[in-house]
């Protein structure tokens, strides 16, 4: 099975090389991005909490050498409901690596828009995604620099992973951060306090009359 997956990834090099946009892969320093219902899995293991968001379940139990899988086909509006309208896609990759085992390999990752590949990540070597962050569902790596899309577009992802040596990896959409409640600036608070004092003074004058 491992040989088949590697062959598939290598064949993709020639056909995908013409696409200019390259997906970026960057390590995450610390437990920053965690998979939650607000950041649902696209490729999932049993620990994913997705709510009603569709995902492709990957083989569990560490009994496979790798994966060559396609995500469900999403509408752009479905993606925007997670990441926020007009925002760019950011995916977290949570690595499960067995103790004492070598680093595993992300061989290829693609985004398809309306059925055509528009973004590619390709790696010909091995061991480019060592586990870095402990804890359940935390991203060890980020995939970014995806093409823009419209609400009416369809979006799908293709995930090729090799040298798997532990439990299932997951790939999840990183949701838009929550908007904090508006807090008045100190100057605004001072002006508000002055205004309240003036109102109180007027009421006192009327009471004396």
Question: What do the PLM-derived regions correspond to, one by one?
Answer:
Residues 5-14, 194:
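Sec-dependent N-terminal signal peptides
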Residues 184-202:
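A short, hydrophobic C-terminal helix/tail in secreted or cell-surface proteins
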Residues 16-20:
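Sec/Tat signal peptide C-region and signal peptidase I cleavage site
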Residues 189, 206-209:
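Localized chelating/binding microdomains
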Residues 1-4, 204-206:
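Positively charged n-region of N-terminal signal peptides that target proteins for export
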Residues 14, 202-207:
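Generic secondary-structure boundary signal with a strong preference for alpha-helix termini
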Residues 21-182:
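Helix-boundary and membrane-interface capping/anchor signal
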